[in-house]
């Protein structure tokens, strides 16, 4: 393994003062890339295996810099891939019966980008994409980037109030959506906050509540006051509009904003994390490198994506990784369905599967699971929330996903900052979120003093590097609260780092329970309770207590048909976890309060439990 001189110098600095990294402004490129005399250069195949170890006995690590960062825009990356593998299948939309090669995808994207410019949108304007996974979603994602327009990822479950907040927050000039999906009638929801659309001239909307919104585009139906997406794309094929597109592209920079993604709002109103071409292109490239997609044949690298495109795991881990590495992306359904996911794997010969722990649980629990052909499966990515070790082992063994990796990140970090290598052991995958990604610094600091923690000691995880967002759109104060002057982004996650650089997420800083002076991390207890044979899901929160400050409350959802008691659960804990970690309260529940994106809102769960327990 290569050893970096810069890392050795940092180790000596850390040994003298754990605070030095908090004020450091960054290593020079020469310092970063210097190697000890006599250490041979690395081949391209070895680069991502060169993971520097934590230094000085402290929880700090810097990813290697052997892989060069790209200055290309998303559009230039699509151009390059279409030129390199024009006939390679790029996109399969299983539920729409659509198949496109990279050459065909580029042609359609160019026309759509040209069409958006032809209707008056310009570089820097914001366009909201509001709807479930579809061909139109991918088309808008890439076309906006090609034209310098900023894509705003709007949750397809948003109702009128949430939609109004999002569109006003970032000043959306255009909005694209299907007429409806299941019970979600998008046009009717828009009319609740923008009744003027029914009588508006298409492309000339004037709305009292949404003053920035001028253009509404319907994906699949002629609706009053809207343009039809097919007509916009058709207009883009005209030569004068393509000329305008080529002119616009001359002024695009990799550091321009490309995407605004709203954080989940588990602790308040959603914030618009703003990402650049530079953020997304490089993160996608490094995800694919660590998955070894660049070393696989087209038949070995077909990616099935049930994750929503409005999340970073879908848009970056899915669309952008496919684009960067020339692999086939398969969208299996508009929204996640376990059965549809298995159908896509079987029919499309899927090799890699991306998803959250909940998605994988549903796939594994399909009653006809054994009837599907999963022989082509090789690996995938699990991310989005903590995954119990038992689930990791089940995915690897039952889904034939020996190359499964766990990924960790945040929307604000584009998103992935830690990830396993495919060849890590099952234990390393089950007990950690892997090791730091290239060109990324990570440190864990004491939440009270801000100093570096020693190895294997919990603290707040902070990230610095190319991946950190440009900021929260229109909220400089919140941006400054999240990203310090030293450019460290504070994740709010409590983590530990071991001697090999493996990182374990143990909870959110706001979720940490302090019981009689003892720090207790809910994720640790949740992992433990998942070993109980009757427990399907569990969430642990702290509830107020006059004597101890906080007490532990375990909110348990049992497997279907199972019954047990609080006393039996507590008996299960004895002798297996410390006595002060045994919950005082055990509450059996059937569901949890969720955000619209499906994340559990622990602050609401805490409120519900305190009310339920009359505290």
Curated annotation (Swiss-Prot):
UniProt GO molecular function: ATP binding; medium-chain fatty acid-CoA ligase activity
InterPro entries, sorted: AMP-bd_C, AMP-bd_C_sf, AMP-binding_CS, AMP-dep_synth/lig_dom, ANL_N_sf
Gene coding for it: ACSF2
Protein name: Medium-chain acyl-CoA ligase ACSF2, mitochondrial
Similarity-based family: Belongs to the ATP-dependent AMP-binding enzyme family.
N6-acetyllysine modification, residue list: 179, 182, 199, 340, 398, 510, 544, 570
CDD domains registered for this protein in UniProt: FACL_like_2
Function of the protein: Acyl-CoA synthases catalyze the initial reaction in fatty acid metabolism, by forming a thioester with CoA. Has some preference toward medium-chain substrates. Plays a role in adipocyte differentiation.
GO cellular component, one term: mitochondrion
Top-level enzyme category: ligase
Annotated catalysed reactions: a medium-chain fatty acid + ATP + CoA = a medium-chain fatty acyl-CoA + AMP + diphosphate; octanoate + ATP + CoA = octanoyl-CoA + AMP + diphosphate
Principal location listed in the UniProt entry: mitochondrion
Modified residues (N6-succinyllysine): 182, 478, 544, 570, 599
UniProt-annotated location(s): Mitochondrion
EC numbers on record: 6.2.1.2
Alphabetical list of Gene3D superfamilies matching this protein: 3.30.300.30, N-terminal domain of ligase-like (3.40.50.12780)
Claim: Ligase is one of the keywords in the record: yes
Transit peptide stretch: 1-42
PANTHER family cross-referenced by the UniProt entry: ACYL-COA SYNTHETASE, MEDIUM-CHAIN ACYL-COA LIGASE ACSF2, MITOCHONDRIAL
Record keywords: Acetylation, ATP-binding, Fatty acid metabolism, Ligase, Lipid metabolism, Mitochondrion, Nucleotide-binding, Transit peptide
Residues given in the record as ATP binding sites: 263-271, 493, 508, 599
GO biological process: fatty acid metabolic process
Source species of the chain: Bos taurus
